[in-house]
Amino acid sequence: MKKIRICHIFTFYSWMSYDVLFQRTELGALEIWRQLICAHVCICVGWLYLRDRVCSKKDIILRTEQNSGRTILIKAVTEKNFETKDFRASLENGVLLCDLINKLKPGVIKKINRLSTPIAGLDNINVFLKACEQIGLKEAQLFHPGDLQDLSNRVTVKQEETDRRVKNVLITLYWLGRKAQSNPYYNGPHLNLKAFENLLGQALTKALEDSSFLKRSGRDSGYGDIWCPERGEFLAPPRHHKREDSFESLDSLGSRSLTSCSSDITLRGGREGFESDTDSEFTFKMQDYNKDDMSYRRISAVEPKTALPFNRFLPNKSRQPSYVPAPLRKKKPDKHEDNRRSWASPVYTEADGTFSSNQRRIWGTNVENWPTVQGTSKSSCYLEEEKAKTRSIPNIVKDDLYVRKLSPVMPNPGNAFDQFLPKCWTPEDVNWKRIKRETYKPWYKEFQGFSQFLLLQALQTYSDDILSSETHTKIDPTSGPRLITRRKNLSYAPGYRRDDLEMAALDPDLENDDFFVRKTGVFHANPYVLRAFEDFRKFSEQDDSVERDIILQCREGELVLPDLEKDDMIVRRIPAQKKEVPLSGAPDRYHPVPFPEPWTLPPEIQAKFLCVFERTCPSKEKSNSCRILVPSYRQKKDDMLTRKIQSWKLGTTVPPISFTPGPCSEADLKRWEAIREASRLRHKKRLMVERLFQKIYGENGSKSMSDVSAEDVQNLRQLRYEEMQKIKSQLKEQDQKWQDDLAKWKDRRKSYTSDLQKKKEEREEIEKQALEKSKRSSKTFKEMLQDRESQNQKSTVPSRRRMYSFDDVLEEGKRPPTMTVSEASYQSERVEEKGATYPSEIPKEDSTTFAKREDRVTTEIQLPSQSPVEEQSPASLSSLRSRSTQMESTRVSASLPRSYRKTDTVRLTSVVTPRPFGSQTRGISSLPRSYTMDDAWKYNGDVEDIKRTPNNVVSTPAPSPDASQLASSLSSQKEVAATEEDVTRLPSPTSPFSSLSQDQAATSKATLSSTSGLDLMSESGEGEISPQREVSRSQDQFSDMRISINQTPGKSLDFGFTIKWDIPGIFVASVEAGSPAEFSQLQVDDEIIAINNTKFSYNDSKEWEEAMAKAQETGHLVMDVRRYGKAGSPETKWIDATSGIYNSEKSSNLSVTTDFSESLQSSNIESKEINGIHDESNAFESKASESISLKNLKRRSQFFEQGSSDSVVPDLPVPTISAPSRWVWDQEEERKRQERWQKEQDRLLQEKYQREQEKLREEWQRAKQEAERENSKYLDEELMVLSSNSMSLTTREPSLATWEATWSEGSKSSDREGTRAGEEERRQPQEEVVHEDQGKKPQDQLVIERERKWEQQLQEEQEQKRLQAEAEEQKRPAEEQKRQAEIERETSVRIYQYRRPVDSYDIPKTEEASSGFLPGDRNKSRSTTELDDYSTNKNGNNKYLDQIGNMTSSQRRSKKEQVPSGAELERQQILQEMRKRTPLHNDNSWIRQRSASVNKEPVSLPGIMRRGESLDNLDSPRSNSWRQPPWLNQPTGFYASSSVQDFSRPPPQLVSTSNRAYMRNPSSSVPPPSAGSVKTSTTGVATTQSPTPRSHSPSASQSGSQLRNRSVSGKRICSYCNNILGKGAAMIIESLGLCYHLHCFKCVACECDLGGSSSGAEVRIRNHQLYCNDCYLRFKSGRPTAM
């Protein structure tokens, strides 16, 4: 620049010279000068051009050097080269940036996207920026992710914008490099800061460089200017040290534990469009709030500084007495330590304006990070002064003046400036006060640039740090009285007013100080004490400002009493500075806590003193006088605490010389000492624990190991070890206890098992003896009834004893008689005849006699037999018919070992299929064979064809809670009554009960028969019969039982019984046959004690009617009934017979039992349980002699014998020794009878089936002939359509040609009529299969004849097609479509008329057994003639299967060689046009699969497009595995389904898996035949072409839904295992027609359970198969599955 300037001056001078010389010289001289000037001008111009070239080249070189310096860091760190020379393009994909930050901090970026797409690069840049934030960069220091985008292809973007964006990236790299330099864990290459000088500015670069290498002096604090985000301790110090790093400065390295170069204000200036000045790019160092200042105190303790005078900031010779603004101050060129500068100061200014005060925003964001600065030594802190400053202005960041204002550091009293001045007010004092206050002014001026909120925030932060109770040690209030210090009255101090003393300065009284209090208090003020002291101070200021009572310590020599009012000691002891709040932690300063008057303390602290203090109020005349309390000279006995305590009691008089104890005795003082010692120990332990906790867990804990002694650590370790040992021992004890309990339980179990085994052996012995002793000749049941009636007519009232309670004695003589047994049986007989109206094949006379049998058995056999021969006739009763198979089956279950018992589900699901009795049963062969029944009652060889309504469903027996509680309470009441009467009775376990929830059929009027029952009995009749009934009831035994009757709620039906009111109570007058009352075992003459827990008094008919009406509304009636006579045993029973109203001509037969209350028929009516041995006990003599403990023992043994309490049949009574009178089954005779009955059943079913077949065949022939007649009119149209179905022509009969053509036409019209097609699909599958007789002609002859007919028909049709095609080309397609629509409607109506859907529930199970057809064949329409071709042999195998492969090769060849005609080509063209406009739906969505359900499939004829297909599958071949017959995958010799019952084979066994029973084929060598076909045909994958010319089963296009959901005798088939679904819990998907056992509801790929709670409801269905979500996704994505 100087050269250029010289050239310009020289040129100007030359032109001036030329002007002058032009006037003064000659022409020659002028020419010379002109040439010289021109040459000089040329030289200047060339110099200017050369300068521009050199400058631009230098700029290029400088920019290249900068870029190389910026890129060298990336290259050195990542060890990778830039892909291009362009800096931006190399960083655009973000890979280098991610590699760079991963090198600086390994693992911060887990995954880098190395794709070449722009999105991948943007993703990497975003990840890089997030990692920078994790390292510690602020958001303002990061560039935008779009700054690296390529802007060269944008016309509107200028080069300056591109440079600005690159500059932002470089700024981020710069701060990242600085972070790397300050990271102690990073030992790689560092950033070249000189390369960024042009970018950042030389001033900031120089300042940052200086801050990186801080000079150090000998007094080093031991800490370095390092950045370490993960480590809390400090590392190696830097190499240099400067004056501002001294320990007395707030900016020192000791006080600020870390220096951070990060800030909210960063190098973002260039992005906003202005150049980034160093002010906005600079950040000053913040103190770390989490670091402790232990090192600061440690260093200050080692190197104490001499105390500077407190008034060093007052005006003197070198300082002006008034404030002078900084610009007007005198410049001082000499720089000494007092005038040092710090670049890190936010308010530092220089003449060149390098730094400014724009850093104010940092205060608001980071001021909370400033730590609490604590003064620690007597030395005052040094105040930094600015350059050229005559008067000191403290800096709030680095200066310690603020700390000195708040700290308890007290200057030496000897250095007080006004110690020897006269104590009077002078103008100098006023001037001093003004000057002193002006020294505070600059401290507040520093805040002028801040907002009010930031100022309050800063002050709040300082005050919180100082007054925070968390960083201070807690004071124990019980550690005794605190030191009472003198109150300093500063009102006389010059420069102070009373208002200045808001917080009184507390100074220790050296004479009265208590070192123990200072030790235990650790110099912290108790908040309670501080509050109380403030009240105490304000209270005392009102009286007088002079301390009144002073306790003096004894001195040798003469006693000196100072004049308190005249003496200047208090004034001389004024501290120079105000102590706002005393800070803790000074090791050499002890400022005791002020302790006020005891009565000013809060009550919770006063309560902890041992001595009660009373406030002594001095008299008014003595209030102005001062007291001087002189202690004793006997210092050995003197106690400062005692003197302090006694000082409140002492008067104004001088105490005697000798020391006398005050109100506290010696015991109190000893107790005080003990309390002090305990408090001191507790306080020490608490401190130790808090320090350890802060050391281990806290961020604020001390980092010095000197705070925790090795002894404390060892004690803590020992405590932890002891705690661990305690826990370990407790665990061992618990484990040992558990083992002992387990061993005891095993012992008890073994003893119970042995007892049970003995009891079983005893029972078997008893049964054998009972069978051997039965020698009485057998009688028929009818003869026994007649004998019993004759005996009843001749016999008088028997003398029977009755066991009754005390309340019944008063009512004995008042009970009128009820009906006799014969009358009751007659009434029940009449009701039975009225109720039985349904026709049956059983003769009606049996039903009329059965009512007598039913009632008389229950009354007659219950009476005690008069002869011992009758008592010992169990063998003859083996021929009796049983209604109580429920009890007998449970007795079988109870007497068996547990391994032989059937579960509840087996007993319930055994109802599904009948089983013959010729096969052996698993279990004990000596026991009778278990049997069940399906549609008829099968007991003892008799058949009852009762067709139950489908809503009579057996539910799982479960007692209602209120019923079970009621039964238990009743039984307990009866036991208590028995013990009071000293009559020992043995209550049997609760009788079996079950609840059947179903709707009952209404068979009776909606009237209450209880009121009409009152009119049935005449007065004379009551008078005649009542004495007899009264006597009989009085001498009878009775039993109390509870009967629960359920029926459909809301129906106005009575429960089927009538009552009669009597003086003793309410009695049952009659029971209607077939009513719920009969099924609930209610009998005539039963006394009704209560209904629904409501008792009724005599003739309380209104309440009775209300209760009955309420019971009818709810459908639930609970009656407490008392039954008299031998039939009633002294036991409390519970009957829950939830009965339906059944209409039958013949009810189930009865088996005679000795105790009717035990022959309860609960759920056997519905669930048809297994028959078994009738095993009961009626020996009352032995029961009466048993004790309560024996009862409990029997109950316990019965519980373990039955296994669990949740079985269908609860506990049963244990037989006793005296049981020869029991009725026992004759097992062999019963087995023979059951076999005969089974054969009879088979014969009846066969006859019924034959009749049904004949009807179906006739109907089928009529429908076929009608359909052929209707379709003959439209033969021409059908032949044209048949030309497109050439492959199906060889597989059809000639008689069916027109029928199939109609279906083909229908499929075309369904494209236009989608709604009608859906209706046809729903209607077609409802047709049932019709079977052919075995006497038809052989199948092979039919096949040969059919093939010949097809060949002839084919030739004729081809000729007709050629003729028809020429004629049809002239017609419009619209007319044809209209005619076809009419044909379709008429045909569908005719077909539907001749169709009769056969209900699957009406077809017996043996239909499948006698015929060899698959059950799926029944789903076909009867309108097809395919089933005519079936012929089965005796074994059920299809003979047609042997002829499958007999098709000649010529026939198959002829199918391939068929050439489509012109009409077919035209049809294909039309379909192609329609396909273009119609989107194809080749998906397998569930909506399209709904048409594949079992009841919504049309008959799938091969080769013909189904209505449901429409245009979806036009291109798919017609003969692939879509239409593959399911039997191709089956064994040839086994055609019947595994679920079809074939009685020629051994019966399948009932297998229980997970408490669910299903059928399993007995021949283990033969797999289930249809299972494989179902699973393979549903995958939708073409495996093999069908070799058969015909299809005789549902096509595979239905996805196997018909096979899996076919009904076998009304039972569904599991879609997974192909077994009968049964009556257990199942998973059914109605929309798709899928049914599964719970254990079969699993994924077909991985076979994981889909019904469990772990997998939830994640079920996917594809091709009618279940998948879990994972397998389905793999299946969709094409990845291999477990299959």
From Swiss-Prot:
The modification Phosphotyrosine is found at residue 185. Residues 1042-1128 form the PDZ domain. The modification Phosphoserine is found at residues 246, 257, 276, 342, 704, 706, 709, 751, 805, 867, 873, 879, 895, 919, 926, 960, 988, 991, 994-995, 1026, 1032, 1044, 1177, 1304, 1307, 1423, 1454, 1493, 1510, 1516, 1563, 1586, 1593, 1595, 1597, 1601. Residues 1612-1678 form the LIM zinc-binding domain. There is a cross-link at residue 1405 (Glycyl lysine isopeptide (Lys-Gly) (interchain with G-Cter in SUMO2)). Keywords: Acetylation, Isopeptide bond, LIM domain, Metal-binding, Phosphoprotein, Ubl conjugation, Zinc. Residues 749-791, 842-858, 1255-1276, 1308-1351, 1358-1388, 1396-1408 have a biased composition (Basic and acidic residues). It comes from the Eukaryota. This is LIM domain only protein 7. It comes from Homo sapiens. The gene is LMO7.
